[in-house]
Amino acid sequence: MSTVTITDLARENVRNLTPYQSARRLGGNGDVWLNANEYPTAVEFQLTQQTLNRYPECQPKAVIENYAQYAGVKPEQVLVSRGADEGIELLIRAFCEPGKDAILYYPPTYGMYSVSAETIGVECRTVPTLDNWQLDLQGISDKLDGVKVVYVCSPNNPTGQLINPQDFRILLELTRGKAIVVADEAYIEFCPQASLAGWLTEYPHLAILRTLSKAFALAGLRCGFTLANEEVINLLMKVIAPYPLSTPVADIAAQALSPQGIVAMRERVAQIIAEREYLIAALKEISCVEQVFDSETNYILARFKASSAVFKSLWDQGIILRDQNKQPSLSGCLRITVGTREESQRVIDALRAEQV
């Protein structure tokens, strides 16, 4: 008699799933953490809501209204969730039939699009980007049949560049009446002029993902947003959990999105951009660095000689970067989060000492 294990009882696609390797899952014992695109120092908040005996609102009014005002959209066009990652999954759950529909994305890019789809049992299709990391529109057109959700990260993680807005428009026309196009704007605060939020009235099938994890310095809060037309938001409300945000999270998010909170965020962005340019200039002068790519974000992608050895050497010194070698077209590349000046100097000094 054969013995059935607990794993045997699991869904086949879950048994075969490779989970997303987050920075925290990968571990490390560093004191310079530059692998998760977090803000380098903590921002202090005081809790003002003391009603922890009551369930929170599903969509806290103050958070929704503050974010709508900040993003320049109507409150009815905003959904708040447990990070933008939940927004990624909600869109698949609302629009894709497992075993029938597909999502489409463009590697090298963020890994959670595929993980979310595979968890639900939805097919993943990819069209690798062109050599300049822009969209291959012909390749996309050839693969759209049966696709319900298209993910485009702009600025793209991990490459750091914006997607050409004209290409976005062509994509939105190709998919009109066929699929939802999701612009992942997790890093848009570092290049706000490039946001597509103003396009929502023109394209009813456009959705935009946002987060408080990066420029707002609240990665530990797990608070993200989906901006879309009311019809899309109403569908997402059918599949979201009844209480996605805890009371403390909603409390802090509302404070972060107050007028003074927005001013503080923009000051942080200016500081990170200045530090980014300092680090880029220094990296370009280091012998083990082959190429430094332009960035519109709070991280830098660079190609190294003997990148695996460099990565391990810095790891052993307590400087934790993100290895991108396994991503398509990113052989030899490491991603470096922009931290404090002290952290930048640690990276620069360690790289200058590398003998490769």
UniProtKB/Swiss-Prot annotation:
InterPro entries referenced in this protein's UniProt entry, alphabetically: Aminotrans_II_pyridoxalP_BS, Aminotransferase_I/II_large, HisP_aminotrans, PyrdxlP-dep_Trfase, PyrdxlP-dep_Trfase_major, PyrdxlP-dep_Trfase_small
Keywords from the named record: Amino-acid biosynthesis, Aminotransferase, Histidine biosynthesis, Pyridoxal phosphate, Transferase
Origin superkingdom: Bacteria
Cofactor: pyridoxal 5'-phosphate
Entry's EC annotation: 2.6.1.9
Pathway the protein acts in: Amino-acid biosynthesis; L-histidine biosynthesis; L-histidine from 5-phospho-alpha-D-ribose 1-diphosphate: step 7/9
Reactions that this protein is recorded to catalyse: L-histidinol phosphate + 2-oxoglutarate = 3-(imidazol-4-yl)-2-oxopropyl phosphate + L-glutamate
Subunit structure: Homodimer.
NCBIfam families given in the database record: hisC (TIGR01141)
Name listed for the protein in its UniProt record: Histidinol-phosphate aminotransferase
Gene: hisC
